C-alpha cells in the first residue's frame, strides 16, 4: 500500500507540472518588484520597471471577496431538517455553538488564506479537524485551550488527485504534510505501533547518514521539496502522505472502500482505517474559480491576464528606454573628426566630409501611455472587478434607477463567483465542522448568545445531545452582500413613497420597515415597538419634573427674600 500510494502521488503530481509552472509565473508577477524575476527579463530593455497591475487586481479582488463573504459578524444560519430540530432550544444551541467555534478557531483567518489560493491558483482546498488544545504549567496544572472543530488549509501544491473524475468528492485524494520528529516521539509514547515504525525510520536515517554516497532508492522514497534523499533523512522533518478514497490492496487482493491511510517516509503505513466522517466521503473540499470541462482543476482570475501584464511591462520599459535615448541620444560621428569633449560650448574640428550628429529615435513610441491605459482598463473588466467596484465612477450623469441597474450589471460576475465560493466551499466546510463536533465532542461547552430584541449577551451550556439534530448550516454572506444593497435601495424608495403619498403610505407597516432598517444596520437595540412614544413620554416627564423643581426653587428664594 505504501508503495502504491507513493507512486500515485508522484504520478498525479507529475501530470500537473505545466500547471504548477503557470502558477509560479502568476505568483512571480504578483509579488515582483522589478521585471528581473519575471518572464519580462528576456526582453533585453535597459529599464526593468514593473507596473504592478496584476498585484492591484489581486488586492482588489481579495478585498471585495472578503467584504462579500463576511459582510457581518454572523454569516450563516442553521436550517432545521425536522420538527425536533426546528425547536427554539435545538436551533439556538446549534447556532450559538457554531458561532462560538467559528469565532474561536480563527475561521476567518484561514478563509482569508483560502481566498488567496483561490485567486492566485484558481483553486482552494481545505479539510476539517477536531482540536483539543491544552497547556501544562510547571506546577502540573492543565489549562484547557481551544476544544472544537477547525478548518485546515491544504496548499494546492500539497494535494494530488485524479482530475478526470466527474466530482471532486468521488476522486481519490492524497494530501502531503510534514511533521517533526518531536511530534512522532510524543505519539510513540502512547502508541506502540508508532514507536515500532519510528524505530525503523530512525535506523534508516542513521544508515543513510553514514553511507557518505548517493543511496539508490525507489521513486516512492523521494520526498518533494528536498534536494536529495540524504538531505531529507538528515532533516528533522517527516513526510506524511494521507490517502482518502478507494484503493486495491495487492497484498490481500481486496479493494479497500472509503479508507483513510497514512504513509510515512513513503515506506511505512502508520494508519489504515475506515473514513471516520459521517458524511460518507472524505472531509476534503475544493472549489475552482472558473470550471474547466472534464477537469477538476479550476482556472484562476489572473490566468488570462499574465500576457497583458507582460505587455504592460514591455511597453513601459520600451518607452523608458526610448525616453532615455531622447534625453541622452547616441552620438553619430562621420568622416574625419578630431577628438573632442562632449560638453556645452565645445568646439569640434571636422575634416573633409566629416560630420557629428545625433541619432534620435522616433518619439511616436512615447504614445504607449494610451495603449497601457487601455490594457489596464481591459484587465479590470476581464478579472470581473469593474472600476466602479474600486470607487471610481464611470463617466456620464445617471438617475438613481440607472445607477442601481449599472451596479448590479457591473458586479454580476463578481457576485456569481463569491456565491460559488460560499455555496460549493464554505457551506460543506461549516457542515463538516458541525459533523466533527457531533462525533468528537465529549464535554459541556459554554457559549454566548445574543438576544435579538435587546442585544443583551448571556451564556449557556451546550452538550453533544443539544447539537445532534437534523439540519444543515447555510452561509449567506455573499448572497446577503448583494441582497442587502438591493433591500436598502428599495427601503429608501418606500420611505420616500410613504412620506410623499399618504394615501399609499397608510398601507405600509412602519413597524416592519423599522425592524428591517435595524437589522440592515446591525443594531438590534435601535428597534423597539412604539419606543418613540415611551421615549417622548419619558422626556416630557423629565421636563415636567424639572419645571416643578425650578418653580419650587424660585418660590423658596422669594420667601427667603433673595
Could you tell me what each predicted segment is?
Residues 51, 84-91, 104-108, 298-309, ...:
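Generic detection of long, well-ordered alpha-helical segments
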Residues 40-48, 59, 246-250, 272, ...:
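Terpene synthase/cyclase
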Residues 89-306:
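Extended, regular secondary-structure scaffolds
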Residues 49-54, 58, 116-117:
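Conserved core architecture of multi-subunit DNA-directed RNA polymerases
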Residues 1-49, 111, 118, 126, ...:
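C-terminal anchoring/interaction modules
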Residues 59-67, 96, 100, 121, ...:
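Short, hydrophobic/amphipathic alpha-helical patches that form generic packing surfaces
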Residues 74-78, 126:
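Helix-loop-helix transmembrane hairpins and adjacent membrane-interface loops
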Amino acid at each position: 500500500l505504501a508503495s502504491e500510494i507513493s507512486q500515485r502521488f508522484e504520478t498525479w503530481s507529475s501530470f500537473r507540472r505545466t500547471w504548477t509552472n503557470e502558477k509560479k509565473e502568476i505568483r512571480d508577477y504578483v509579488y515582483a518588484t522589478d521585471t528581473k524575476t519575471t518572464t519580462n527579463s528576456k526582453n533585453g530593455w535597459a529599464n526593468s520597471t514593473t507596473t504592478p497591475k496584476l498585484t492591484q487586481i489581486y488586492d482588489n479582488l481579495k478585498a471585495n471577496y472578503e467584504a462579500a463573504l463576511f459582510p457581518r459578524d454572523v454569516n450563516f444560519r442553521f436550517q432545521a431538517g425536522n420538527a425536533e430540530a426546528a425547536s427554539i432550544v435545538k436551533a439556538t444551541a446549534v447556532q450559538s455553538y457554531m458561532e462560538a467555534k467559528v469565532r474561536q478557531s480563527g475561521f476567518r483567518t484561514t478563509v482569508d488564506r483560502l481566498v488567496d489560493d483561490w485567486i492566485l491558483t484558481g483553486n482552494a482546498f481545505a479539510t476539517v479537524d477536531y482540536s483539543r488544545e491544552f497547556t501544562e504549567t510547571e506546577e502540573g496544572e492543565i489549562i484547557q485551550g481551544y476544544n472544537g472543530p477547525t478548518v485546515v488549509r491544504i496548499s494546492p501544491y500539497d494535494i494530488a488527485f485524479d482530475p478526470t473524475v466527474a466530482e471532486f468528492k468521488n476522486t481519490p485524494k492524497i494530501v502531503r504534510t510534514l511533521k517533526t520528529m518531536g511530534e512522532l516521539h510524543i505519539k510513540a509514547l502512547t502508541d506502540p505501533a508508532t514507536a515500532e515504525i519510528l524505530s525503523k525510520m530512525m535506523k534508516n536515517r542513521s544508515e543513510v547518514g553514514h553511507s557518505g554516497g548517493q543511496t539508490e532508492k525507489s521513486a516512492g522514497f523521494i520526498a518533494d521539496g528536498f534536494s536529495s534523499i540524504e538531505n531529507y533523512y538528515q532533516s528533522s522533518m517527516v513526510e506524511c502522505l494521507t490517502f482518502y478514497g478507494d484503493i486495491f490492496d495487492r497484498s490481500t487482493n481486496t479493494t479497500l472502500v472509503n479508507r483513510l491511510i497514512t504513509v510515512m517516509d513513503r515506506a511505512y503505513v502508520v494508519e489504515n482505517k475506515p473514513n471516520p466522517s459521517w458524511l460518507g466521503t472524505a472531509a476534503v473540499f475544493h472549489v475552482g474559480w472558473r470550471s474547466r470541462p472534464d477537469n477538476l482543476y479550476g482556472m484562476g482570475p489572473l490566468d488570462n491576464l499574465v500576457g497583458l501584464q507582460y505587455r504592460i511591462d514591455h511597453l513601459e520599459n520600451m518607452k523608458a528606454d526610448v525616453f532615455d535615448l531622447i534625453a541622452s541620444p547616441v552620438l553619430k560621428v562621420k568622416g574625419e573628426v578630431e577628438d573632442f569633449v562632449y560638453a556645452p560650448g565645445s568646439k569640434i574640428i571636422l575634416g573633409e566630409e566629416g560630420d557629428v550628429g545625433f541619432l534620435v529615435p522616433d518619439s511616436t513610441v512615447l504614445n504607449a501611455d494610451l495603449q497601457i491605459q487601455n490594457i489596464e482598463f481591459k484587465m479590470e473588466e476581464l478579472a470581473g472587478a469593474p472600476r466602479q467596484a474600486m470607487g471610481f465612477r464611470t463617466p456620464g450623469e445617471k438617475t438613481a434607477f440607472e445607477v442601481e441597474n449599472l451596479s448590479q450589471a457591473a458586479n454580476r460576475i463578481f457576485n456569481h463567483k463569491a456565491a460559488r465560493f460560499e455555496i460549493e466551499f464554505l457551506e460543506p466546510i461549516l457542515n463538516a465542522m458541525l459533523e466533527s463536533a457531533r462525533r468528537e465532542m465529549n464535554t459541556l461547552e459554554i457559549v454566548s448568545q445574543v438576544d435579538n430584541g435587546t442585544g443583551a449577551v448571556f451564556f449557556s451550556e451546550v452538550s453533544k445531545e443539544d447539537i445532534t439534530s437534523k439540519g444543515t448550516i447555510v452561509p449567506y454572506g455573499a448572497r446577503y452582500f448583494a441582497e442587502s444593497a438591493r433591500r436598502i435601495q428599495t427601503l429608501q424608495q418606500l420611505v420616500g413613497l410613504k412620506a410623499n403619498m399618504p394615501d399609499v403610505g397608510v398601507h405600509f407597516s412602519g413597524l416592519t420597515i423599522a425592524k428591517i432598517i435595524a437589522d440592515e444596520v446591525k443594531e438590534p437595540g435601535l428597534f423597539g415597538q412604539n419606543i418613540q412614544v415611551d421615549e417622548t413620554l419619558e422626556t416630557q416627564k423629565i421636563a415636567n419634573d424639572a419645571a416643578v423643581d425650578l418653580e419650587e426653587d424660585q418660590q423658596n428664594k422669594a420667601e427667603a427674600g433673595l
